[in-house]
């Protein structure tokens, strides 16, 4: 992370010494038990999608908490792992909106400029939201603020009540916010189905002179 295009701008948004606190937190929790994703993948979203490449932000809450699932990108799992229910629903909506994506590893999206950011970057095994409110939210809020300050128009995709609260951080009128219910089985019928976020994002990118995302890659 220190050498990425994000580092200095995120640091400028945070209180003095906050990166040190994050390092201390990670040393502590990874030494005490099983934490996901693997330590080397905690910042994977920022390492895969450089600041100068961001076109779309898809905000998740926290990583998957089962073995082998979390890979540092919101909603994504390796193809060797069955797609969790929320991801199944995302891919079904994509299929209805644009077409079928055969892989449920979303790394190809990240490589095209889709920042797959969780608000909380770590989770204890088997404990959803187990690290919520401890260290990560100021950091990931800073990431959102850095993107908000870009002159280049960006699409923010906010699914569910938690992500939609982050709308307050997106104040730049150049950007587009696409919001709906969360793709989880509990809320998918409350407005996620039929929301067409993928075609809407691409229409906006084309309107603003940017290359659309190949969501099926």
Curated annotation (Swiss-Prot):
Enzyme Commission (EC) number: 3.2.2.27
Pfam families in UniProt: UDG (PF03167)
A molecular function (GO) term: uracil DNA N-glycosylase activity
InterPro entries found in the cross-reference section: UDG_fam1, Ura-DNA_Glyclase_AS, Uracil-DNA_glycosylase-like, Uracil-DNA_glycosylase-like_sf
Reactions listed under catalytic activity: Hydrolyzes single-stranded DNA or mismatched double-stranded DNA and polynucleotides, releasing free uracil
Any one GO cellular component localisation term in the record: cytoplasm
Top-level EC class: hydrolase
Highest taxon listed in the record's lineage: Bacteria
UniProtKB keywords: Cytoplasm, DNA damage, DNA repair, Hydrolase
Subcellular location: Cytoplasm
Residues annotated as the enzyme's active site: 62 (proton acceptor)
GO biological process, one term: base-excision repair, AP site formation via deaminated base removal
Gene3D superfamilies reported in the protein's UniProt record: Uracil-DNA glycosylase-like domain (3.40.470.10)
Family annotation (HAMAP family): UDG
Protein family membership: Belongs to the uracil-DNA glycosylase (UDG) superfamily. UNG family.
Physiological role: Excises uracil residues from the DNA which can arise as a result of misincorporation of dUMP residues by DNA polymerase or due to deamination of cytosine.
Protein name per the record: Uracil-DNA glycosylase
Source organism per UniProt: Streptococcus pneumoniae (strain P1031)
Phylogenetic lineage: Bacteria, Bacillati, Bacillota, Bacilli, Lactobacillales
Gene assigned in the entry: ung
């Amino acid at each position: 992370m220190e050498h990425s295009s994000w580092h200095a701008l995120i640091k400028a948004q945070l209180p003095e010494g906050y990166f040190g606190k994050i390092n201390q937190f990670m040393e502590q929790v990874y030494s005490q038990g099983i934490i996901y994703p693997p330590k080397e993948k905690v910042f994977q979203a920022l390492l895969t999608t450089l600041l100068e490449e961001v076109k779309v932000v898809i905000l998740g809450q926290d990583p998957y908490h089962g073995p082998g699932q979390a890979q540092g990108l919101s909603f994504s799992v390796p193809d060797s792992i069955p797609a969790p229910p929320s991801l199944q629903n995302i891919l079904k909506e994509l299929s209805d909106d644009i077409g079928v994506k055969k892989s449920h590893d979303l790394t190809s999206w990240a490589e095209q400029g889709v920042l797959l950011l969780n608000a909380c970057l770590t989770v204890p095994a088997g404990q959803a939201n187990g690290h919520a409110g401890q260290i990560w939210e100021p950091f990931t809020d800073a990431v959102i603020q850095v993107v908000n300050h870009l002159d280049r128009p960006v699409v923010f995709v906010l699914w569910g009540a938690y992500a939609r609260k982050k709308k307050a951080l997106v104040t730049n009128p150049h950007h587009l916010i696409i919001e709906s219910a969360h793709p989880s089985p509990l809320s998918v019928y409350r407005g996620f189905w039929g929301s067409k976020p993928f075609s809407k994002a691409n229409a906006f990118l084309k309107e603003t002179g940017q290359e659309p995302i190949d969501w099926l890659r």
